[in-house]
């Protein structure tokens, strides 16, 4: 068995085209284009790269993109004041704070300062709570992107045993909630989990997000499983790989996401979907 590749680049491009069309329809109807404010603190090269990609994507589909590049020594108070200004700016639909923030700034406090209806990353406790209550509004981008990939490939996951390896607030935990909402029986594993191999071997659907290259051997993959690799790791030779040993896993899985080109593009695609949704909320309110 050789797994079918789940092409995140292709699906992300489809979504961008769909959103661009909806934006043009809004503009023709006399409505404003969606507006996303992206806040970058400091000069982390990886963060700068991600922010540049997000801004270019927004502009390419007709969004208004506002850039707020703050110095590394900005205070938490100053950052919170900027967020308050963006919260009350009626022309701004979405606010994105690029993580990680510098040492000395409380990530949780900053994310909680964003108005829930402008929280296009889906990290605010209100939005996470809505997801837990089976009434999601703005959803965390990477987990929602995974669900979209499965839907676009017509992969039925209802009733499957889903195992999430990694329990981060950004990916693992909301991923578990998304899979539960989709009808899976969900196990979330973490650093204290015993018998990780046994959990992985029982997974009909395996989602891995730990940030460790090749952490899951292909021999652990259940024959015919669906493998979603969210990890992005850069090796010393410059090669980018995931958390799953791809060359081994592809021989056992039924479906698998590559790294790069799998889940990564879907995170940005979901961000623009969320921003358009936030724009619609603003109009309704």
UniProtKB/Swiss-Prot annotation:
Q: Which PANTHER family match?
A: C-1-TETRAHYDROFOLATE SYNTHASE, CYTOPLASMIC, C-1-TETRAHYDROFOLATE SYNTHASE, CYTOPLASMIC-RELATED
**Gene Ontology molecular function, alphabetical:** methenyltetrahydrofolate cyclohydrolase activity; methylenetetrahydrofolate dehydrogenase (NADP+) activity
Q: Does the keyword Coiled coil apply?
A: no
Tell me which EC number(s) this protein carries: 1.5.1.5, 3.5.4.9
Q: Which UniProt keywords apply?
A: Amino-acid biosynthesis, Histidine biosynthesis, Hydrolase, Methionine biosynthesis, Multifunctional enzyme, NADP, One-carbon metabolism, Oxidoreductase, Purine biosynthesis
Q: What does this protein do?
A: Catalyzes the oxidation of 5,10-methylenetetrahydrofolate to 5,10-methenyltetrahydrofolate and then the hydrolysis of 5,10-methenyltetrahydrofolate to 10-formyltetrahydrofolate.
Q: Which InterPro entries match?
A: Aminoacid_DH-like_N_sf, NAD(P)-bd_dom_sf, THF_DH/CycHdrlase, THF_DH/CycHdrlase_cat_dom, THF_DH/CycHdrlase_CS, THF_DH/CycHdrlase_NAD-bd_dom
Lineage top rank: taxon: Bacteria
Q: Which gene encodes it?
A: folD
Lineage in the entry? Answer: Bacteria, Pseudomonadati, Pseudomonadota, Gammaproteobacteria, Candidatus Palibaumannia
Which HAMAP family has this protein been placed in?
THF_DHG_CYH
Q: Where does NADP(+) bind?
A: 166-168, 232
Q: What is this protein called?
A: Bifunctional protein FolD
